[in-house]
Amino acid sequence: MMELRCWGSDWGLPSVHPECLVVLAYARFAGAPLKVTPVDYTWASPKGTVPFLTSAGEDTHQPANILNFFRKQKYNADYVLSAKEGSDTLAYIALLEEKLLPAVLHTFWVDTENYCNVTRPWYASHTPFPLNYYLPGKMSRDALDRILVTRGQPPLYSLSEVEAQIYKDAKECLNLFSNRLGTAQYFFGSTPTSLDAFVFGFLAPLYKAHLHKVNLQQHLKQLSNLCHFCDHILSAYFVSDDAGTSAAGQEAIDANLQKLTQLVNKESNLIEKMDDNLRRSPQNRPQKLSTLKPVGGAENSHSSDLLSH
């Protein structure tokens, strides 16, 4: 049995982490049997990174390597692709990593409002002590280093210039993928492939997170077909997950709970009215009982018993 260690669920997603989502989605598309173990207070990773896959004593890291491992085990979501579609898939994934991922990393890990109010609290609460004081800050620094290494070259010298450029590129990338998807359900044919897994993994946290700085998120939400794409994958492949409940499912639960509460209140009111009617009924008036006086120290004994409880 293959075991995948990944960051846990929230925001209606099976994982809040883009690369973990890529692996989870591809595994569902390919039908790979996985035991999913969220990072918790017993977390230990050989290289300190997630996602990582363990199978027969062999550890595999990084989404691309994990997906290749699945393919070697005959779990291949790309078997329907032609040679041209396969090469297009590689080009599109490279475009996502070059043009979209830096802005996603910046949104969650570098932007001060989102990092302090959303990202750091979430990851710190899901990381074992004392690593929870160190790991979120390290992940933030790693994200910034990754952005600067890939995009901080001349003529972009200052961080503000880099930020402006990566968000411009990300919006253009989102527009391109929106146009490429069009009205289709998936990017290639009627079944999802690795490209769908990467697009879903990178977009879903941006789409679903409760961000404070929503610049890129607002642009994504204006591209309704990409939002529907994420919603469809969640409902088609993750609806039965115990890890989380979709927004629509939560609304249904809340509505049923409200109806049940109203029904219970109605029944309680009815019972109270019946009880009042019974009290007012002549044949059910309680008989006046004579006052019983305690014998000896019984009263004091009873009081002591009550106090002892």
UniProtKB/Swiss-Prot annotation:
Main localization, broad class: mitochondrion
Domain of life: Eukaryota
CDD domains for this protein: GST_C_Metaxin1_3, GST_N_Metaxin1_like
Signal peptide positions (record): none
Entry's Gene Ontology BP terms: mitochondrion organization; protein transport
SUPFAM superfamilies: GST C-terminal domain-like
Location of region: Disordered: 274-309
GO cellular component assignments: cytoplasm; SAM complex
Swiss-Prot/TrEMBL keywords: Membrane, Mitochondrion, Mitochondrion outer membrane, Protein transport, Transport
Residue ranges, compositional bias (Polar residues): 280-290, 300-309
Record function comment: Could function in transport of proteins into the mitochondrion.
Family affiliation: Belongs to the metaxin family.
Oligomeric form and interacting partners: Part of a large protein complex spanning both mitochondrial membranes termed the mitochondrial intermembrane space bridging (MIB) complex.
Annotated PANTHER family: METAXIN RELATED (PTHR12289), METAXIN-3 (PTHR12289:SF30)
Name of this protein: Metaxin-3
Gene name of the record: mtx3
